[in-house]
Regions:
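Aromatic-anchored, charged helix-turn/loop surface patch used as a conserved interaction hotspot
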Residues: 2-4, 8, 73, 81
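A short, structured beta-strand/loop element
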Residues: 4-44
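Long, charge-rich, low-complexity alpha-helical segments
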Residues: 28-81
Length: 81
């Protein structure tokens, strides 16, 4: 099953065991969030680690992460931290 949870974020059982990734990639949202938490800027993450992403995609991931923390629901799929 594939669920789009953001403009750039998907949950797809066929990709990375259903973990949140950026649409059209195998880049895990959690990996990008961890880099930001470690102090890297969005520009550094995109330039040095994931050039297939752009600033809008990373900001979408941050917005999605905030929704997860609040216990947001996506259709029939409950998303929880």
């Amino acid at each position: 099953m594939r669920v789009e949870v953001g403009k750039y974020i998907v949950l797809d059982d066929e990709v990375c065991h259903g973990r949140p990734t950026f649409k059209g990639t195998r880049v895990l949202v959690s990996d990008v969030i961890e880099l930001l938490a470690a102090g890297l800027s969005i520009e550094e993450v995109v330039r040095d680690y994931y050039p297939s992403l752009d600033e809008k995609m990373v900001k979408d991931a941050l917005a999605w992460a905030a929704k997860v923390i609040r216990g947001w629901r996506c259709g029939e799929v409950e998303v929880s931290a």
